[in-house]
Each structure stands twice: as structure tokens, then as C-alpha cells.
């Protein structure tokens, strides 16, 4: 688990195209408890300077529910589910993280990149939509409901990705999650993101056969491309994506 401002040996710091683009450090953290990531991203944000590179942390969490700072605890429907609940300082309501889900934390200096919060959210959403499209899954935004939803078919309207950020001193932390191949039953114990009866789905249930690591690589490429306003080629060299801290 990284601690601010020291960098783990496994970090890959690369500058995406074009050459003038700002560098991004990608950290592959494997399976890490949620509390450890939460504490580390806040410490990183508090310690960063105007010269600190932006970072993306890619992680898989053991089962945990997280409740946003304005979230209503009543959206946890089963008090004795056996899954811990952590109250956090991001926006949004309650969600679930667990094995088989990609979680990507975006530690971004919005002022340096001249990004408004809404612009950053839109670019994150577009990166997720493009990632899912790479596996022949059509998805879309939904007005008034942050996240990404299945666009067509029998699971139309089901949520497949969640998003929630915190901005402190012009810098973001927290991020997004994409359901790849996971046990979806814990979502039945909550109103996902505060919406009663909202179906939650994963890529495997929609027929996608790609594994977690492959999808994570695709997602990171798209996120970095969109951080710099790109909409085309992958932004990270494959060798950098393949580094891990195993």
C-alpha cells in the first residue's frame, strides 16, 4: 500500500502522448482493504504539492459497503449482512465493492489540468463507456444518476459502473468502479447509489469474457487519454500497464 509522498517500487510513471501532456503515475495495488486505500489517498492529497504527478490507483477490494458523506444509512437494507460499512467523504450514496470489480482512484490536480469538476466527471464516464464498448457492451449515462448504465437488451438500465469523487484544494480523490465478474448478491442488500430496486449487473453477465486485468488495462488507457482531452489512441505503453506489485 503506498503512503504519501513515497512511491512504491511497482509504480509506473509515464507521460502520455502528446509529449506536452502532463505525466500520470499508475499504481497496481492488487487486493487491498478499503480502509487502507481511503487513508492513503487522503494523505496523498494533503501532502501533494503543485509539482506532484497525478496518479491513478487500480485496486480490488475485499467486500465492503461505502456510504458517501451525505448518504442515508437507510439505504443499507440488511443490517446484519456481514459486510462492513465505511462512511467516507466522497459524493453519492451507498455502493458495494468486492472481488471481481475494478476500482480506480483518480488523484488529479484539476487546476493544473484546467479542468472543471463536471468536465472531469464527463471524461471519466466517457472512458468507462469506451472501455465497455471495447468488449461489445453498449452503455450510456443517465440524467440525474451518476454512473454508467446498460444501454440495450434485457438488462437495459442496469448499473454496471459507479462514480464518486471528492475535491480538496483543487485536487480529486476517490474515483470509479466497474463490475467485471463478481458476486452481485451484496447489491441486493442496498439501494445502489440511493435508488430502490436498481438492478446492478457485471460484464460477465452480459457475455463479456475478458478477465479483470485485461479490462483494467483498457480502462487505464482510456482514463489517461481523457485526462488530457484525447479521444483516440491508447495513452499508456503496454509495458507500463503490465507492471504490478505482486
UniProtKB/Swiss-Prot annotation:
One of its GO terms (biological process) is protein modification process. Residues 50-231 form the BPL/LPL catalytic domain. The active site is at residue 193. Substrate binds at residues 90-97, 162-164, 175-177. Pathway: Protein modification; protein lipoylation via endogenous pathway; protein N(6)-(lipoyl)lysine from octanoyl-[acyl-carrier-protein]: step 1/2. Signal peptide: none annotated. It holds the Pfam family LplA-B_cat. It catalyses: octanoyl-[ACP] + L-lysyl-[protein] = N(6)-octanoyl-L-lysyl-[protein] + holo-[ACP] + H(+). The keyword Cytoplasm applies. The keyword Cytoplasm applies. One of its GO terms (molecular function) is lipoyl(octanoyl) transferase activity. SUPFAM superfamilies: Class II aaRS and biotin synthetases. Keywords: Acyltransferase, Cytoplasm, Transferase. Belongs to the LipB family. PANTHER family: LIPOYLTRANSFERASE 2, MITOCHONDRIAL-RELATED, OCTANOYLTRANSFERASE. In the reaction, the free carboxyl group of octanoic acid is attached via an amide linkage to the epsilon-amino group of a specific lysine residue of lipoyl domains of lipoate-dependent enzymes. This is Octanoyltransferase. It comes from Burkholderia pseudomallei (strain 1106a).
